[in-house]
């Protein structure tokens, strides 16, 4: 395409003076495009951060993060954005953060989402955790797939027993009705995950298989996990879930597989309690 004759081509380390403002440029490849670049205004100490520090969601009049309830209304979407778009590229995000931390920044202006002018360190710390695959919260999340409701029941019973053991804020998700982007974000947030899945055509229920491959593709690591399978004749879901999980880095996987044959039986509650013990020790 035609390029305007007055266009100035810039590269890493270049600066442009517009009077009192001096703009410096730095490449942040794969955050989230290969050619991504940020701009720093040394006079106002503003970092124009491109997609970094952005979120899903549209502004509703207020443009600054300190003008909204960011923790309650925006943080989940900020996490979901970062981990789903560049979760795989923790290294490049770390490189971008190292460049940013050498600057005296008073304001961060992302391409989308609120502008940051207060508590910058708090949000930068979130990026530090997300890009190093460090869990934010000491919570258990149970993710299940269920065909007839029996695996769902087992997941709910397990969640109740986790609560009885003192676990706070246990979350339970049906992978068939929850968009994978939310589940990936929850897996990045929590430090412990239980996957419950029925055997389907000698394999995994498709929604659970998709989720596990999404987690692997986004480089999830450093989690404590357990699996629960359901299968009446030849249950194989547990083995296949573990095969995918074992390919992820630094995962602590519960050795035993709890097998439900059609419906959870009372004499299997002790097996659920062993998962609870593993998750809470």
Model-based region annotation:
Residues 32, 52-87, 131-136:
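Active-site-proximal loop/helix segment associated with metal-binding centers of metalloenzymes
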Residues 6, 29, 124-125, 172-178:
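Short gly/ser/thr-rich secondary-structure transition/capping motifs
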């Amino acid at each position: 395409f035609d390029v305007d004759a007055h266009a100035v081509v810039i590269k890493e380390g270049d600066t442009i003076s517009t009077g009192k403002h001096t703009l410096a440029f730095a490449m942040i490849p794969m955050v989230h495009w290969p050619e991504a670049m940020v701009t720093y205004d040394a006079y106002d100490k503003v970092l124009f951060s491109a997609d970094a520090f952005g979120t899903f969601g549209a502004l509703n009049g207020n443009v600054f993060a300190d003008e909204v309830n960011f923790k309650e209304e925006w943080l989940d979407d900020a996490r979901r954005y970062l981990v789903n778009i560049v979760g795989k590229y923790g290294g490049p995000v770390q490189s971008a953060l190292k460049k940013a931390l050498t600057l005296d920044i008073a304001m961060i202006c992302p391409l989308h989402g609120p502008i940051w002018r207060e508590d910058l360190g708090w949000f930068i710390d979130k990026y530090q955790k997300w890009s190093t695959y460090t869990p934010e919260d000491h919570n258990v999340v149970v993710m299940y797939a269920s065909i007839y409701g029996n695996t769902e029941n087992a997941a709910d019973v397990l969640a109740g027993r986790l609560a009885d053991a003192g676990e706070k804020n246990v979350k339970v998700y049906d992978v068939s009705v929850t968009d994978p982007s939310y589940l990936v974000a929850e897996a990045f947030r929590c430090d412990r995950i239980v996957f419950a899945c029925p055997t389907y055509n000698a394999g995994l229920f498709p929604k659970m298989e998709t989720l596990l491959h999404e987690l692997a593709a986004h480089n999830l690591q450093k989690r404590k996990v357990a699996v629960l399978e359901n299968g009446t004749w030849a249950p194989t879901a547990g083995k296949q879930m573990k095969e995918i999980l074992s390919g992820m880095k630094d995962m602590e996987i519960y050795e035993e597989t709890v097998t439900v044959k059609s419906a959870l039986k009372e004499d299997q509650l002790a097996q659920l309690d062993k998962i609870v013990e593993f998750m809470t020790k």
